[in-house]
Amino acid sequence: MIKSELVQIIASRNPHLFQRDVENIVGAVFDEITNALAEGNRVELRGFGAFSVKNRPARSGRNPRTGETVDVEEKWVPFFKTGKELRDRLNGAV
């Protein structure tokens, strides 16, 4: 599912909302999650999961095409840990 499909599903299940309003709401939610992560904060959605950022330290890598050793810089990457309710639902427990 892509963002536009998510918007369409939410709009169809909530006929009292205009699709453009749903687009704005979904966009605002994603923007706030992104902003919080960019500030180094954790975003927890109870029952669904938690978004956080993890540090990947600098390391030596290898160019697969040439075999040349390259230095890979330190970077921060997004991380998502599923919540118990989501895991249970995916595994048929609910």
UniProtKB/Swiss-Prot annotation:
HAMAP family: IHF_beta. SMART domains: BHL. Signal peptide: none annotated. Belongs to the bacterial histone-like protein family. SUPFAM superfamilies: IHF-like DNA-binding proteins (SSF47729). It holds the Pfam family Bac_DNA_binding. The lineage of its organism: Bacteria, Pseudomonadati, Pseudomonadota, Alphaproteobacteria, Hyphomicrobiales. Heterodimer of an alpha and a beta chain. GO terms for cellular component: chromosome; cytosol. CDD domains: IHF_B. InterPro entries: Hist_DNA-bd, Histone-like_DNA-bd_CS, IHF-like_DNA-bd_dom_sf, IHF_beta. This is Integration host factor subunit beta.
